[in-house]
UniProtKB/Swiss-Prot annotation:
Localization annotation: Cell inner membrane
Subunit structure of this chain's protein: F-type ATPases have 2 components, F(1) - the catalytic core - and F(0) - the membrane proton channel. F(1) has five subunits: alpha(3), beta(3), gamma(1), delta(1), epsilon(1). F(0) has three main subunits: a(1), b(2) and c(10). The alpha and beta chains form an alternating ring which encloses part of the gamma chain. F(1) is attached to F(0) by a central stalk formed by the gamma and epsilon chains, while a peripheral stalk is formed by the delta and b chains.
Domain of life: Bacteria
Species this chain originates from: Escherichia coli (strain K12)
Consequence of changing L31F: In uncE408 and uncE463; unable to assemble in the membrane
Protein name: ATP synthase subunit c
Reported impact of G23D: In uncE429; unable to assemble in the membrane
GO CC term (a single one): plasma membrane
Amino acid sequence: MENLNMDLLYMAAAVMMGLAAIGAAIGIGILGGKFLEGAARQPDLIPLLRTQFFIVMGLVDAIPMIAVGLGLYVMFAVA
């Protein structure tokens, strides 16, 4: 029974990290598409849009990093 609980713990950590990575990839893809739409619509605002794009992309990309940290914590510290 203990071995089954450990397996479920590892699977839960893997699902958490995987779903966070997939969600961030989708979010960055949508964000990049909207950046290109805005840059094509108003080329004079590209420097402002680029700055905002990189700030938001960093925030979106931080979510999977936090999920990886929590997943590794669950796998090695809790287990």
